[in-house]
């Protein structure tokens, strides 16, 4: 048998183009034997059967599953952070309302009095305590109004707009609450201990219930400020993870 010599082969890019098509392809070669007689050989490749498709699907499936597995933890983390944000807001609302109600109901009258004086103390006697009550009432109202935005962050975990708005307003309310609580804490300290240099006498020994209720209100306000700080840190961390 005479050897066959290949004179011409289709270019490689044309072969690969045909390989990528779902239909069968024809690979044509011009060959010639030693006598110079040209012969054309055609090789037909059948269509990819279902078994081949199954193999191709098996090869691509791990990539899709890996991508979904990589996205699911991130989305779950963001949703969990949003739920934790809502929980912190509810706790801050409770602390803010507690501080407001405790200060608003602070009132004590001593059982003894003179012909010209009656010993009575309430929060409106000091402008610091009045400002404290107003600031905590505003903070509590803001936290209630911020609940829908927190719920939006749960439903749409990748929404950056509501989080950015919340982090700005939370920072403002945290600053107001902290300043009001700090000023009231200074007054409470003087009420308990007095100041001999300024000749301010401690009056909490006489108005014990009054001072105790004011102290509880200040503690609740500091708790609300700490929860607001936690909300700011949580929102900032969530925004950083969105990049």
From Swiss-Prot:
Keyword flag Signal: no
The record places the following residue ranges in the Extracellular compartment, namely: 101-131, 185-216
The molecular function terms of the Gene Ontology recorded here are:
protein homodimerization activity
Q: Which residues are glycosylated?
A: 195
Q: Where would you find this protein in the cell?
A: Cell membrane
InterPro entries, per the entry? CASP/CASPL, CASP_dom, CASPL
- Looking at the UniProt entry, the stretches that span the membrane are 80-100, 132-152, 164-184, 217-237
* Cellular component terms (Gene Ontology): Casparian strip; plasma membrane
Renumbered to this chain, the signal peptide range is: none
Any Pfam family matching the protein: CASP_dom
Q: Does the keyword Iron-sulfur apply?
A: no
One GO BP annotation of this record? cell wall modification
Q: Which UniProt keywords apply?
A: Cell membrane, Cell wall biogenesis/degradation, Glycoprotein, Membrane, Transmembrane, Transmembrane helix
Taken from the record's topology, the Cytoplasmic segments are: 1-79, 153-163, 238-243
Topology versus the membrane, per the UniProt entry? Multi-pass membrane protein
Q: Which domain of life is it from?
A: Eukaryota
> Subunit structure, per the record?
Homodimer and heterodimers.
Q: Which NCBIfam families is this protein grouped with? A: A_tha_TIGR01569
Family, according to the entry, reads as follows: Belongs to the Casparian strip membrane proteins (CASP) family.
Q: What does this protein do?
A: Regulates membrane-cell wall junctions and localized cell wall deposition. Required for establishment of the Casparian strip membrane domain (CSD) and the subsequent formation of Casparian strips, a cell wall modification of the root endodermis that determines an apoplastic barrier between the intraorganismal apoplasm and the extraorganismal apoplasm and prevents lateral diffusion.
Protein name (database record): Casparian strip membrane protein 4
* Species per Swiss-Prot/TrEMBL record: Populus trichocarpa
Q: What is the lineage of its organism?
A: Eukaryota, Viridiplantae, Streptophyta, Embryophyta, Tracheophyta
């Amino acid at each position: 048998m005479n050897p066959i010599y290949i004179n011409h082969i289709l270019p490689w890019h044309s072969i690969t183009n045909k390989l990528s098509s779902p239909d069968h392809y024809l690979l044509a070669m011009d060959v010639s034997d030693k006598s110079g007689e040209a012969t054309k050989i055609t090789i037909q490749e059948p269509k990819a059967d279902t078994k081949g498709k199954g193999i191709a699907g098996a090869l691509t499936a791990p990539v899709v599953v890996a991508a979904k597995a990589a996205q699911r933890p991130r989305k779950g983390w963001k949703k969990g952070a949003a739920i934790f944000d809502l929980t912190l807001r509810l706790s801050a609302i409770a602390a803010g309302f507690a501080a407001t109600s405790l200060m608003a109901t602070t009132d004590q009258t001593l059982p003894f009095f003179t012909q010209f004086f009656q010993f009575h103390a309430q929060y409106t006697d000091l402008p610091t305590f009045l400002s404290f009550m107003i600031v905590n009432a505003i903070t509590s109202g803001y936290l209630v109004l911020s609940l829908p935005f927190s719920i939006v962050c749960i439903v749409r975990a990748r929404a950056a707009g509501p989080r950015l708005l919340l982090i700005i307003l939370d920072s403002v309310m945290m600053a107001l609450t902290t300043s009001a609580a700090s000023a009231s804490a200074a007054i409470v300290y003087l009420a308990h201990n007095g100041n001999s240099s300024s000749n301010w006498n401690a009056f909490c020994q006489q108005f014990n219930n009054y001072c105790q209720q004011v102290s509880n209100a200040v503690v609740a306000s500091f708790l609300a400020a700490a929860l607001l700080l936690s909300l700011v840190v949580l929102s900032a961390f969530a925004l950083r993870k969105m990049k």
